[in-house]
């Protein structure tokens, strides 16, 4: 996956989460449906669990529900 594709995917994920506390499954379905061909369930999962969550851009509110952090909002501004 190229850097530009990663950035597009991360931006889409953060935009969906910014709309409110969203369930993981809804975020995944919306992202895979609206992004380009490179956005598969596997690439979504890797970006979400291996990058956004561990680096503090997204935080877990309750089981399966996530929200964007201030750090995540800064990243979204940079990507926009």
How should each PLM-predicted stretch be described?
Residues 1-20, 80:
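Short alpha-helical segments that sit at the start of domains
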């Amino acid at each position: 996956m190229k850097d530009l594709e990663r950035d597009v995917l991360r931006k889409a994920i953060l935009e969906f989460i910014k709309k409110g506390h969203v369930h993981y499954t809804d975020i995944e379905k919306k992202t895979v449906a609206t992004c380009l061909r490179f956005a598969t369930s596997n690439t979504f999962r890797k970006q979400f669990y291996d990058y956004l969550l561990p680096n503090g851009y997204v935080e877990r509110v309750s089981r399966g529900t996530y929200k964007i952090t201030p750090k995540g909002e800064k990243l979204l501004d940079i990507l926009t």
